[in-house]
Amino acid sequence: MATDTFSDAIREFEHDGETYKMADLTVLEEQGLCDLDKLPVSIRILLESVLRNADGDQIDADSVRAAASWEPDVPDAEVPFTVSRVVLQDLTGVPAVVDLAALRSAADRKGVDPTVVEPEVPCDLVIDHSVQVDHFGTDDAYEKNVEIEYERNEERYRAIKWAQQAFDEFNVVPPGTGIVHQVNLEHLGRVVHEREVDGEQWLVPDTLVGTDSHTPMIGGIGVVGWGVGGIEAEAALLGQPINMSLPDVVGVRLSGELPEGATATDLVLHITEKLRQVGVVDKFVEFYGPGVSQLSVADRATISNMAPEQGSTISMFPVDEKTLEYLELTGRDEEHIELVREYLEAQGLFGEQEPEYTETVEFDLDEVEPSLAGHKKPHQRIPMGDLDDHFPALLEEQGVIGAGGEPAIGDGSGAAAADATDAGPGLPLDEKVPVELEDGTEVEIGHGDVLVSAITSCTNTSNPSVMVGAGLLARNAAEQGLEIPDYVKTSLAPGSRVVTEYLERAELLDDLEELGYHVVGYGCTTCIGNSGPLPEPIENAIDEHDLWTTSVLSGNRNFEARIHPKIQANYLASPPLVVAYGLAGRMDIDLETEPIGTNDDGEEVYLEDIWPDTEEIRQTIHDSISPEMFEEKYASVYEGDDRWEALDAPTGDVYDWDSESTYIREPPFFQDFPLEKPGVDNVEDARALLTLGDTVTTDHISPAGLFGEDLPAGQWLTERDVPVHEFNTYGSRRGNHEVMMRGTFANVRIENELLDGKEGGYTVHHPTGEETTVFEASERYREEDTPLIVMAGDELGTGSSRDWAAKGTDLLGIRATIGKSYERIYRDNLIGMGVLPLQFAEGEGWEELGLEGDEYFEISGLENGLEPNAELDVTAETDDGETVEFSVTAQVDTPMAVEYVENGGVLHLVLRRLLTEELN
């Protein structure tokens, strides 16, 4: 705890007859180190952590002074931030479990007690990313999907159960419970923790990191938390502070109130668009102003959820009366809620705040209008009334159709001339093709038709206003006799069981089911690409006619090929609009002026005819939701169903690796582990494995979805007699490095400019010029002892906090990446794996420098080690001796990050320290 320098800041706090210790921020103000009223609330919370954990070793008095000295226009200072807990989801949690198991195995091989590898902060792993929508539209869809989920993931789930018994304070929320961020919001989040440290009770603010980029959703209840890669989360679990540069903090001042008919989803799409324009990457965002009181906590959580889409590290709302009311509504203990109030008031962390910010952004809630986002980025907001013009323009832009809606000459890839009018292999915009489904149903589909309509994702299923709104709209539609077209795959995947409970109590679940929105699972499903298969005849029609079909979902991401590889255009919308566009069956429609369908009397029905009013939604929520619901549903949150209880899992301190397993294999990271750190040196005679454009996502780098037998990962499984129907997804195979390294840079939509933008995981081997897969090329380079680099444009690694995007990069032999800019989590994950993230100088890039990607590359300036933000020199030399020289900056901001790189990664550093302590 706090060093002698700040021992006065450790004070006693009395509450209800109990005495607690606390790190009192007001003492720092009394000492003249800060003006608390001027510090953003998020910075105060960071400051409390630094103060409380200052031990004179990893966290010293200078760190406390640095955090206390935050000012809007002062250069960043490095501070070590220690979180109070960690949350994991299973796709990123399984590789974390595998890494922890591998660390124990490495310790055991060195003759060290393996239990030295032990989490030092509490951890919750929520299994939510594995359920897929194989069955839908029936009463038994949920049971069938869960049954298949266990069949596919039994081995992974056994490893998770092993971890639960092997590690202290490692809790597992079993399948079928909910989505990690909604469970976190409704139950796990405490706002303030009571913790025992060395026999004394302490009060500490709830802070966390999570292995999912949408962890900032917890900011809706005033908790500082953000997404990190599994690598960094594991380090935090093992007691490592997160060394970070104090961020700029952008204050968003909200005014006004949402107009009638506008939803929290519409609001978050507006804010996401706005903050992407402002530029908040690597920054904290705090919301304040009179408009905040007009938003429910669920609305706030919807906004906080999309922090990564906005570009920020966190988007938070400081705790106020509405926060405490939400804690009460969701079944938190009344005595704890009062403790939260008193502690936060004592720390100056409660109620309306107007501190000084790096930048202030004004946002008027009155200006929000019904909107969607698409076709492939969450910040591409489109007013609902503009969709009928948007979609034809999109198809022309992509070269799918020419002027007048006729098919363009070409293959639908965008290569055709936009003004071509001669019929090619495609389909005119206004024509349909007949398709006979497996059950004999005949449908017609064309460009713009909605094939997936999914009420999904914690972004929106955590918000009763939009869920009840969707239910009421479904009721009104059913009463009019409206139906969903047979070609639309409908699904409802609540983020917690409480949602189903209040929809049933409000008698709205039946109305949703009447339209086909049956519960398919309690997990992420379509939002993360687990939408399941489309009917084979529909997929065949898409391929045969180059159809640009669509999906509409209440999620937070719509990247290319994420929702389904056959669906080209994906749109984010509120749950009521998801139902509305499902009813319409197409996206090229103006629902403000065109009918959504016809009723039983043949009369045209418009969206406004079935849209529920705000007061009806509010009254339904009031009548249908109670604290007892939350208490009941979360009383057995760690127990699971009969399937989970019956699952036979390994026991013991060291995991028993199965060399025949295709799901869980010991990774190579800590095998033959040296106690000396390897350091870092110049890179010579490197080759570019890929050259990429802008906004290459972690989905592009490490896809999570299905893959075929023709790809390297599929070939590896086929060689081990795994049938194609048991391949499962990349995400489910993250405990197997053999599959994952073969899947790196293997997304079907990634475009490698070494092959003139050809889609898929292909590249050129130099100097032979042979086209091959990225994995096969990397293996040839490995045999030739050739180091590799990757070059890219802006926003490299945007998207999900996918540690395998960095692990796979490392295992392919890539020593450095060079991009114009990076998304924070991917950059940090690269550092966490010992890979150098380098940035071109302003105004430069591989294209601007005239690089082709077939050169030899030398990175110099590392002969004496690495310094934070070091400027390095790169020389690119062609086969005929011509050279291009340019400078890059190492995006390694702190001395601790340098240590990670020089040790080959953060876990390598942690293991090296643990082993050294035990062996010396």
Question: Where do the model's predicted regions map?
Answer:
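Segments forming glycine/polar-rich beta-alpha architectures that bind adenosine-containing cofactors
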Residues: 650-726
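NTP/phosphate- and nucleic-acid-binding module
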Residues: 724, 728-737, 741-771, 779-783, ...
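Extracellular/luminal Protease-associated
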Residues: 288-295, 556, 778-822
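Long, structured ligand/cofactor-binding scaffold of large enzymes
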Residues: 55-257, 264-269, 370-373, 392-395, ...
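Mobile "lid/hinge" segments at catalytic clefts and subdomain interfaces of large enzymes
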Residues: 199-341, 347-350, 466-469, 474-486, ...
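Acidic, glycine-rich flexible loop/linker segments
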Residues: 599-614, 826-900
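Acidic/polar, glycine-rich intrinsically disordered N-terminal extensions of enzymes
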Residues: 1-82, 96, 652, 663
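Terminal amphipathic helices with adjacent charged low-complexity linkers/tails
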Residues: 82, 100-156, 292-417, 593-657, ...
